[in-house]
Amino acid sequence: MTYLTRILETKAREVAELKKLKPERRYREACGDLPATRDFRSAITSRDGGINLIAEVKKASPSRGVLVEDFRPLDIAARYAELGASAFSVLTDSHYFQGSPDYLKAITQQFSIPVLRKEFIIDESQIYETRLMGADAALLIVAALEPSQLRDYLQLFAELGLHALVEVHDRRELDIAIEQGSTIVGVNNRDLRDFTVDLMTSVNLKREYPEGVLSVAESGLKRRDDVLLMQDAGFDAVLIGEGLLASEELRQFSWG
């Protein structure tokens, strides 16, 4: 069983319990009168050849376990903001990443920077939940969805004022993302089947992006040269988490 399959099975059980506690109709009703979201797309759009930082607030991962023992999400986010982050990515999955919706809510209330919810979304109820949390954008993983699901979810995102970062790992998934109307596409250098990382995944796929689609490189970016590789390839932004905490080079990088 792959990492992704295991995670999605767990998520399906979580969503079933969630919908028992609060039917989707109640989520829809609660989203009827909310303040406008912040513009995630504009925040991460490259200008003058620079590259933007989506800084990830993450406590743990399935492959490496706990990354930050004394985990203080607001302190980490403040550090990222000082570094010049254009947006935050916040893990809300509790089972595999030790994340929490509470972390996301606290960060959205404390900072004016747009916030991406990093989650394994497989049901519409999670999209309404995302909006109610105060997120401005969320992740949609092509490998976790049917193409028709992706299309429907993108439409719901737009109706709720959310932006979607649509994640792909190969050319087939990129084609699906584009065909279904994605306007922000991230390439995950980590293969979610076995969690191996290859930075050339992003470089090679960037050549296939159509004009007008924003590009984000995700995972495995640990050094200044890694970011420069993505900048030279033409990416609008990179999504980095643990690398920022570990690398002085990345902390001193000139973002934007």
UniProtKB/Swiss-Prot annotation:
**GO BP:** L-tryptophan biosynthetic process
| CDD domains, A to Z | IGPS
Q: What is the top-level taxon of the source organism?
A: Bacteria
Picking any one GO molecular function of the record gives: indole-3-glycerol-phosphate synthase activity
In terms of HAMAP family, this protein maps to: IGPS_B (MF_00134_B)
Q: What is this protein called?
A: Indole-3-glycerol phosphate synthase
Q: Which UniProt keywords apply?
A: Amino-acid biosynthesis, Aromatic amino acid biosynthesis, Decarboxylase, Lyase, Tryptophan biosynthesis
Coiled coil location: none
Task: Give the record's family classification.
Answer: Belongs to the TrpC family.
Per the UniProt entry, what species is this protein from, by scientific name?
Answer: Chlorobaculum tepidum (strain ATCC 49652 / DSM 12025 / NBRC 103806 / TLS) (Chlorobium tepidum)
- EC numbers: 4.1.1.48
Which NCBIfam families did the record assign? PRK00278.2-4
Which enzyme class, named as a word?
A: lyase
Q: Which InterPro entries match?
A: Aldolase_TIM, Indole-3-glycerol_P_synth, Indole-3-glycerol_P_synth_dom, Indole-3-GlycerolPSynthase_CS, RibuloseP-bd_barrel
Pathway assigned to this chain's UniProt record? Amino-acid biosynthesis; L-tryptophan biosynthesis; L-tryptophan from chorismate: step 4/5
| Keyword field contains Oxidoreductase | no
A single Pfam family it belongs to is: IGPS
Q: Does the keyword Amino-acid biosynthesis apply?
A: yes
